[in-house]
Amino acid sequence: MLRGTTKLQKACWAAFLLYLIALLYYTIFAESLGRRGAGDGAEARYNLVLFNEILRFWVYRDKLGMRAFVLNVVGNIVAFIPSGFLLPAISRRCRRLPGIVLVGLSISFLIECTQLVFRVGSFDVDDLLLNTIGVILGFFINRFLRRWRWKRQMAKEQRKIKIREIDT
């Protein structure tokens, strides 16, 4: 599986696996986030109307608290930034925007389906949208940092060339 990979790719694989474990914990098992198992008599909850839950959290932010709104909206985005950041380093498919969107959306969809089947949290199309936005942000952060590093390396090479020209 990891034959022929660089140390950076191996480190990214390890980081991605740790990230997935943490993501699964918070999206499936974290009781502090209101996760209840099917044994608690919970009904399967779902939202298939885009922006419905986001709007509901905004409208009732005075009753639910601004923390609930931020946790739902910003939390769903931030939770998927690492996947958009790490996946391009470990998968060639994820080095272009369509590939990373497809993989990120698939991961999010699997988590939402797991929540529906085991009746923890809820299946929410708003979460799919917000998670995908997070993946895209992570992808562009990765791309920005790679270009920045490349430009730094090129500038360093240019300085070396100028020093060699001066020495000769």
Spans of model-derived segments:
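Bulky hydrophobic segments
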Residues: 1-120, 125, 139-168
